[in-house]
Every structure is written in C-alpha cells, then in structure tokens.
C-alpha cells in the first residue's frame, strides 16, 4: 500500500486559486455550452455562477409603495391552476386561526364588555384555484373591529371576506372568556366566574347558521358511590364518603329566531345541573356545596339528559349537542357522554381529541 503524504508546496495558495479561476472564467467566456457541459460537474458549477449584484444591507425606512410598484409584486396564491400542487380538489376550509384582538360585546342588560377574542376565519377554495390571500380575512374582519359585536356584525364581516376572496362557503368562529358575577351559596359573597364561549357563523350552500358553544364546569357526585357510602354507614357504622369530581360539559346550540343571550345559555346549564363549581367560598358555602351535591347526584348519562331537557324547552334553540366528561376521582379514566338533536351536529366519526378537549384550565 502506498501512502501519499501531502506536502506544503502541493497545496495551491489563495493567489494560485484566484489565478486559476480567472483563467477558467476567461476560457468560459469564449466556450460554448457544450464545451462547458463536457467539464467535470464540480468545475462546471464554478463557471456557471452568474455575477450577483451588490445589494444594500440597510433597511430602507424611507421607501414608499405606490400602485405601480404594488402591481409588480408577485401574487402566487392567485396564480393559474397549473401551479396547484397535489390533487386538484376542492378544499372545504382554508384560512387563519387564532388571530386575537379586543372586541366589544353587547350584554343582556344593555351594557357592553370588551374581551380578548381569538378569531378563526375560513373560506372554501374551489378545485381550480391555487390559494387565497389569507391576510384579506383579517383585513375584512378588522373593518368591523370597533363595532359592538353580535351576530349581525359577524354576518357583515362574513359578507366582506366572502366578497374579497370570491368564495362560496365561509365560517367565522370567535372564542372568548365571558365573565359573570356569581353569588356564593350562603355567605353573601360574590365573585367572577369565567365561561369559555365561542360564537360561530357558518355559511354553506347559501344557508347560514348561528351557533354558540359554552363550556360549563360543575361537580358530579356518583349516585352509586353515594349509596355505597350510606350502606357502609347504616350497616356497619363505617364512615365513608362518595366520590365526586370536577366535570365539564360543552353545550353547542344552533340559534333560532331571537336567539339566546350568553346569560340565558349559562342559566339553562345551571338549571339542568346546579352543582356549578364555586368562586368565593367560606365554610358555610363549602357545607352548602356538599349538601347541594348530595341532593343532585348524577351519572354522566344523567348530565347529558338534564342539559338537553333545558335546551329543548327554549324557543331560541334549534339543533343542539351536549358533550359531558366526568373526570373521575375513583377511576383512572373519564366517563363521557354525547347527545345530539338535529342534523347540524350529527356525525359518524368523532375527532380522537374531542373528549380530551373537555378539560377546565384555570
């Protein structure tokens, strides 16, 4: 085996490399494309490099854009169908999610409240369209950002971004945390309870639906555990306590007619299952809460039906869905239920993360 040791004078110097590159460039300026293609690919790359202009590295803060310049800007999303990647298929929803801004909402008593709101806006995209200019969704929504929001304003925003984007179907969803003053059970104290609420306006096939979602957090005492505890007390004089747990229901309603105020929907939930978790608590309130739970033990099946009983009795509610999750203190798993009324919320397949999303984050 021969070992070749590189010596210092075998390594070209920088000057020699520059000279060699100059010779190569001079040759390439006169050579044909076929001659350059015949070179070793590594060498050919050296002579194919086009001269790159010197560019400014400083941000041009004084540069202004006029219509003529704007017209020269590339717009890939509005390009021809030939630029589409993948299957040339219609997309039901494409847009932006979770852009946030403060929004004023009309309250049932005639006042207004400003709340941080997370907005999701999507439109349909036809098969022969490359894409959408997503910033138009936000710009269209911002035109109405100073209004006092109700579904009429959301509809106006939807009209605008459908027109701006030339889409057939569209959706706006607005998520917020709605505060309500809630009295304690016995002490006379009160505190702010926050309710996760989402407003959703959907247009599909020319038909619009107004939907409200509410997460309601309550305590559920297991009826079976309550009876077993009482059995231990009665038959053996053994102290025992039934298990109860924080539970979450997501109530979704399609609005009809005059619709439903946030406060009305919350009151319906509270009337169905009165064991709502408490805000301000003294000892007498804690005792009262224990009594309230003992008076209203429920399985997760009971919870779904109790909520449904309230919803189906309200004239402002059309289709609805009730999902409940009792996050068991006895078991390592949760107990869940889902009840729907009408076609709006009927579905064959469920999102694998649907029930795990029923969690209260303080």
UniProtKB/Swiss-Prot annotation:
GO terms for molecular function: GTP cyclohydrolase I activity. InterPro entries: GTP_cyclohydrolase_FolE2, GTP_cyclohydrolase_FolE2/MptA. Coiled coil: none annotated. It catalyses: GTP + H2O = 7,8-dihydroneopterin 3'-triphosphate + formate + H(+). It is an enzyme of class 3 (hydrolase). Its EC number is 3.5.4.16. Keywords: Hydrolase. It holds the Pfam family GCHY-1. The keyword Protease does not apply. Pathway: Cofactor biosynthesis; 7,8-dihydroneopterin triphosphate biosynthesis; 7,8-dihydroneopterin triphosphate from GTP: step 1/1. The record marks 222 as: May be catalytically important. One of its GO terms (biological process) is tetrahydrofolate biosynthetic process. Belongs to the GTP cyclohydrolase IV family. Converts GTP to 7,8-dihydroneopterin triphosphate. NCBIfam families: PRK13674.1-1. This is GTP cyclohydrolase FolE2. It comes from Jannaschia sp. (strain CCS1). The lineage of its organism: Bacteria, Pseudomonadati, Pseudomonadota, Alphaproteobacteria, Rhodobacterales.
């Amino acid at each position: 085996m021969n070992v070749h040791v590189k010596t210092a004078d075998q390594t070209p110097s920088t000057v020699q490399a520059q000279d060699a590159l100059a010779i190569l460039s001079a040759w390439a300026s006169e050579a044909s494309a076929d001659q350059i293609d015949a070179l070793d690919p590594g060498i050919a790359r050296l002579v194919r490099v086009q001269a790159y202009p010197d560019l400014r590295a400083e941000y041009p803060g004084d540069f202004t854009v006029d219509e003529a310049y704007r017209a020269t800007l590339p717009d890939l999303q509005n390009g021809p169908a030939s630029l589409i990647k993948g299957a040339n298929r219609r997309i039901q929803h494409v847009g932006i999610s979770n852009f946030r801004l403060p929004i004023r909402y009309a309250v049932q008593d005639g006042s207004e409240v400003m709340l941080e709101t997370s907005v999701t806006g999507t439109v349909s995209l036809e098969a022969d369209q490359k894409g959408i200019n997503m910033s138009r969704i936000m710009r269209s929504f911002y035109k109405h950002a100073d209004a006092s929001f109700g579904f009429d304003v959301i509809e106006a925003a939807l009209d605008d971004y459908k027109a701006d984007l030339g889409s057939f179907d569209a959706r706006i969803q607005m998520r917020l945390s709605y505060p309500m003053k809630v009295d304690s059970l016995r002490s006379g104290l009160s505190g702010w309870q926050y309710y996760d609420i989402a407003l959703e306006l959907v247009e599909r096939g020319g038909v619009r639906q107004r939907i409200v979602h509410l997460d309601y957090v309550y305590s559920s005492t297991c009826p079976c555990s309550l009876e077993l505890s009482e059995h231990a007390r009665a038959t053996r004089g053994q102290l025992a306590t039934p298990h109860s747990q924080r539970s979450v229901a997501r109530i979704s309603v399609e609005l009809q007619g005059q619709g439903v105020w946030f406060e009305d929907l919350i009151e319906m939930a509270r009337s169905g299952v009165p064991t709502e978790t408490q805000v301000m608590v003294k000892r007498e309130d804690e005792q009262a809460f224990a009594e309230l739970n003992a008076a209203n033990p429920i399985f997760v099946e009971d919870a779904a039906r109790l909520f449904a009983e309230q919803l189906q009795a309200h004239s402002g509610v059309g289709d609805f869905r009730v999902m409940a999750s009792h996050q068991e203190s006895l078991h390592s798993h949760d107990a869940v239920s889902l009840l729907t009324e009408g076609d709006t919320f009927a579905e064959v397949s469920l999102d694998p993360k649907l029930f795990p999303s029923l969690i209260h984050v303080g």
